[in-house]
Amino acid sequence: MISFSEATRFTPEKYEETRVWCKEHGHPLPKYLLYPRTKGFVSTVQHLRQAEHVKAVYDICIAYQHRDIFMAAPDMLHTFILGKLTERHRYRFHAHVRRFELRDLPETDVELAKWLEQRWLEKGEWLAEQKERWSKGQKQS
């Protein structure tokens, strides 16, 4: 199961809405990301706790760049029709994956929502670090 907690595609307009919402509600603004919608994630995790075979939650963050434009993702059409996006078309991609044991996640809905918010802030920091590295021509970490 995959949960896209931003709930919509990132656009400059959506980021501005996120900035305003975070300011009005006293939440920190994640870098390069929309503020996560927590209800679906919280509900899913609470139900997955009941499944014996589910042991972990994976947090995946993908950084991408086209030529010199950070977080410029290829659209679906280009993904399917253009072969070798990285070599021929100068896209860069890097996925950062972390595993969190389900038993180690907070128990209450409120704390679980805060946990997700913290992951989002960490993702934003990681993306900022990737942008800095890539702008200097350094390898991913």
Q: Where are each of the predicted segments found?
A:
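A cross-family acyltransferase "interaction/gating" segment
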Residues: 2-110
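Pan-eukaryotic secretory-pathway lumenal catalytic ectodomains of glycan-active enzymes
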Residues: 87-141
